[in-house]
Regions:
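Short, charged, amphipathic alpha-helical segments
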Residues: 39-49, 75-83, 130, 134, ...
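Amphipathic alpha-helical repeat scaffolds of TPR domains
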Residues: 1-7, 27, 43-73, 99-123, ...
Length: 212
């Protein structure tokens, strides 16, 4: 699965074509799954899932950046891509062992996509599903490494933990929220929240004050 990171970034029609090809490849492998014997065949399926999930994730990211919320078809397409990416990533995560090198990155992707679905900002969104929030918090916490986490991952973790703490106060979540909030403060823009605003949040949120 290391080869995925070395692939060039695609966009537009090239990305659409790559997704269609990845879907076809994965479907072919799954149709022949009864004939797949041994680790090599299973790894081929995992590789295909990894590629398809990465491509779908990229298309969702591109769509979100330019989304016209009045375009119902574009919104529906982005949601469908995100749901497919979650399903494919979930299947991959189920297959991987937690001690495999690829597991943390897959867990982070699944957690991030789950939080995006939980906080869906587009018109016609379904009610937020707490299961998505739990998946986001739990998998981001398991997949992230404090000293190595980038700004994006740290922001997702902070926001997901904050939202879950608002729903159901939990001492462990409050402590984790403080920890990752401090990590987010290490970045110049604090993930877009602004260091001053984040600092005030960490100082004055009632459930965080009690965790300090």
């Amino acid at each position: 699965m290391n080869s995925i990171a070395s692939r060039p970034l695609l966009s537009g029609e090239d990305l659409d074509t790559a997704i269609d090809q990845a879907r076809t490849e994965l479907a072919g492998l799954l149709r022949g799954s009864e004939d797949i014997v041994g680790t090599g065949g299973q790894e081929a399926v995992a590789e295909a899932r990894t590629l398809l999930a990465a491509l779908l994730d990229r298309r969702v990211t591109e769509a979100a950046a330019r989304m016209d919320e009045r375009d119902g078809r574009a919104v529906a397409a982005a949601r469908a891509d995100r749901n497919e990416a979650i399903a494919v990533t979930g299947a991959l995560l189920y297959w991987l062992s937690a001690d495999e090198a690829a597991w943390p990155e897959v867990a982070l992707t699944f957690g991030r996509l789950s939080y995006d679905r939980y906080t869906d900002p587009w018109p016609g969104a379904e009610s937020p599903d707490p299961d998505d929030l739990d998946a986001a918090c739990d998998l981001l916490l398991r997949g992230a490494r404090y000293d190595d986490a980038d700004e994006r991952t740290t922001l997702y973790l902070f926001l997901a933990l904050r939202d879950r703490q608002h729903l159901l106060a939990c001492p462990n979540d409050a402590k984790a929220l403080m920890t990752w909030g401090r990590r987010l403060l290490m970045f110049p823009d604090a993930g877009g929240l602004g260091r001053s605003s984040l600092h005030d949040m960490l100082e004055f949120e009632p459930f965080l004050v009690t965790a300090q």
